[in-house]
């Protein structure tokens, strides 16, 4: 198997964009077919996001959303579902109820599902992985937290941590009303309300 640098060099050796696209598609298809053969002729599906290459892109364009439900249905239509599914995942996560719908759909179609995580299957990707019969990971592979995450103060934080912070504020203020002055600048940053 070639290294990342070798693949980039092979791609760059193509003389024009049309041949680069043909090289990419041809090698991608050949790789999926090779994985299928290695996995006893299972159906192989790749779900990936360019979230590492496009960090400034809006998250909604890079994560699992309700649109992916139709994508999964379209790709799976016509597959011999008795062969099982090998799902290769690379995702930062996404919308929880969209993930639940995808898992329900996959489970309704395949009696045996395995997930390969080459690098990242975070958050909602972790949920899909945990719903599989098997997860195949390398040394560098990572799963992520599955608790709800929310934007707060320009960063993503655990919704449970926000609730815990509110409970702490409530307790401290109910025990000593003067604590309200200390919590006043903090509380607006904890939630969307």
Pin down the residues of each PLM region.
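Terminal-region recognition feature
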Residues: 1-120, 126-193
């Amino acid at each position: 198997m070639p290294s990342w640098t070798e693949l980039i060099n092979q791609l760059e050796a193509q003389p024009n964009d049309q041949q680069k696209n043909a090289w990419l598609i041809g090698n991608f298809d050949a790789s999926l077919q090779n994985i299928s053969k290695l996995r006893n002729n299972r159906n192989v599906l790749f779900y990936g996001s360019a979230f590492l290459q496009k960090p400034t892109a809006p998250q909604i364009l890079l994560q699992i959303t309700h649109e992916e439900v139709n994508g999964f249905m379209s790709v799976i239509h016509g597959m011999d579902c008795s062969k099982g599914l090998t799902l290769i995942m690379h995702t930062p996560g996404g919308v929880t109820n969209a993930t639940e719908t995808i898992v329900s759909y996959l489970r309704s179609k395949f009696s045996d599902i395995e997930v390969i995580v080459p690098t990242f299957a975070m958050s909602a990707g972790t949920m899909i992985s945990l719903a599989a019969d098997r997860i195949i990971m390398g040394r560098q592979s990572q799963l992520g937290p599955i608790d709800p995450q929310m934007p707060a103060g320009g960063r993503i934080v655990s919704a449970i941590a926000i609730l815990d912070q509110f409970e702490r504020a409530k307790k401290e203020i109910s025990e000593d009303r003067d604590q309200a002055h200390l919590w006043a600048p903090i509380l607006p940053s904890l939630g969307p309300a």
